[in-house]
Amino acid sequence: MTGDGIILWEAHRGGGYELPESTPVGFEYAWMLGGTPEADVNATADGRLLSLHDGKLGRTAREIDEETGRTPIAELPYARVRRCDIGSDRYPEQVIPSIDELLAKLRGDVRKEIVIDYKNAPLEQLSELIARFGVAKQLTLATTDEAVAARFRQLQPEVRIKIWLGGAPGEITARFDALAAREFGGFEQVQIHMNDDPERKFWRYALPPDEVRRMLAAAQAKGVLLQALPWQFEREDLFAVLDLGVRSFAVDYPNRFCLLCAEYFAVRTWEKPLR
């Protein structure tokens, strides 16, 4: 998306809340909107890597027995997990995609990229898959664990690394400042979670705008991309974050986000009088 710069955005858990999360249709939806879907990586009992946020099936799978729903993915064979439908009434019969299926999509189209959020899988196995498909430059590994990030940097130096920071505002700023003091660990991206402020005194989020602006400047000074994840947003909320200069987002509402960004830049493009 053009304007005063490029908007780089990620669809949280694939299709966000607009389509069933971590599904084939959700990933395609994000790609077709021009974004980068996020895939959470977990491993099954027989060693297959797949994209599912939770360590269990109970929340997302439809019509499964209670025992299967509460059993950790790491204790289930891939064939059993693959039989589960994680779609919805509108989008039924959606299977859990394997990581190799998603990487094959990247290999088939160099314009596609993906974010892999590390959950529970052998890093060496994930690295081997990426090498097999030759798609390292189309990938970002996301994690909150700097030790995981450092290890994966050794395994796959061409894969971009993103450290995500969650929690209360004080926790986020403390971790950010510690990262900045270490030159951001040599990693390319930092994501800050923007939780709602229950009081909403002058803007929606608990993290004050001055802090967001300060972190953005610190990241830019070192060539690091700062990404915001606003869990909820309306028009005025997103516009306020864009006004701070943030140009990278992770969102749960991809289509609404794209429409609002188009409006934001369209309005500002025509603010100056024509000559």
Residues covered by each model-derived region:
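Phosphate-group recognition and catalysis centered on beta-loop-alpha active-site segments
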Residues: 1-275
